[in-house]
Amino acid sequence: MIAEIHGGHGVGCPVCSGPMKHCFSAQVLCKYQADYEVCDQCGYLRAHDPHWLNEAYTSAIAAADTGLVMRNLAVASKLAGVLYWVLGERGKGIYLDAAGGYGMLTRLMRDFGFDFYWADKYCNNQLVPGFEYKPQQGPCNAVTAIEVFEHLTDPAAFIKETLEFSGARTLIFTTELYVGDPPEPESWWYYAFATGQHIGFFQRRTLETLGKKLGLHVSSANGIHIFSDRRIDESILRIVTGRWVSRAAPWWVRRRLGSKTFSDHELMLQKIG
């Protein structure tokens, strides 16, 4: 199974085991005082003892997340180019969207022509019923984890267990990185104090520390981050995930791989019948 997204916190940094130091306090869920601490060694920043998580996850998707659809569209367009031009997908591989929420990204990627599947232990599959991933299907070429890392208490465990579950050696994910000192509480929207669901934050060096710990290479460009056992040219990744290429990628890829929209529709009708 995929690792727990939220759970208990240890004393030291879960990324590098270094000491954590207090950096600021803020109110979460409009009622709980939370302390935030940072690791000077790797830059990992987290909420200390997030005891409010059960309350924060009464709904897996926060009601205030009005940008969910637009972000999925943007990420799917970038992923189409990454899978086709960077990983060389030509229609034979299978993919998993871990912690896939309602299934929106999986549906979009199948519409583009990729054989994508879904898994999420905290959310119901609303949009791609019948396309839940099972290890018996065989190893995935890659696994995605979109907007997951900021919810984790132990990112290393999540990476390891997700790759083991999927059989993949490449994990493509998104999370907003910060640069330099931890941003002031009032200056960074990504803390998302009102929802209480974002509890861990990363720098580029945090990702590099995780990669070294797990024996994986790290690549990052335009908000797309990759852990992989293969080296990925960041200059190519930057081009493929850039504005102009990512806008054209869905159209290009769909024409070459063939959309699964209608074939999935027919499959669902067969199951109903």
Task: Describe the role of every protein-language-model region.
Residues 166-171:
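Short glycine-dipeptide loop
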Residues 146-149, 174:
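Residues lining the SAM
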Residues 151-155:
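Di-metal (Zn2+ and/or Mg2+/Mn2+) metal-binding site signature of metallo-dependent hydrolases
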Residues 1-142, 146, 156-165, 187, ...:
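Conserved N-terminal segment of class I S-adenosyl-L-methionine
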Residues 174-200, 205-206, 210-212:
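Short, glycine-/aromatic-enriched active-site segment of Class I SAM-dependent methyltransferases
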